[in-house]
Amino acid sequence: MKDLHKHRSRTVTEGVTRAPHRAFLRATGLDDEAIDKPFVAIVDTYGENTPCSMSLNQISDNVRLGIAAGGGVPIRGSAISVSDGTSMNHSGMRFSLVSRETIADSVELFVRAHCYDCLLYTSDAANEGLGVDL
């Protein structure tokens, strides 16, 4: 029977065959105690291409502190941000809606490939938020 209380990240960290994985995680600065905790992915659409997303770096830094204080291991990732403000009224607008799928795919790949236990996502606008909602 599957242990419902077992963290998904144990797929990456438990057992002799996962020694290389643990070594890789140690190279990121994690110690054995951290490796035993739940891994929480933090993904945002920070970028300097729009004023809407420029605060996301600070927000994610604060989220990181909260996750650590709560007993999790925060692991940051990022997704693209396409600004309608500067992409509209020219060929760039063709990429706005497409960016939603790209965002959704990249966030899913980041979380599933690394077997993270949880995801906290912050975005600045409808395109990015809807991308993850997809």
Question: In which residue ranges do the predicted regions lie?
Answer:
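Conserved small/polar residues in nucleotide/adenosyl-binding loops
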Residues: Y121-A125
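Metallocofactor- and cofactor-centric catalytic cores in central/energy metabolism, strongly enriched
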Residues: M1-L120
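Hydrophobic alpha-helical segments, chiefly the membrane-spanning helices
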Residues: V132-L134
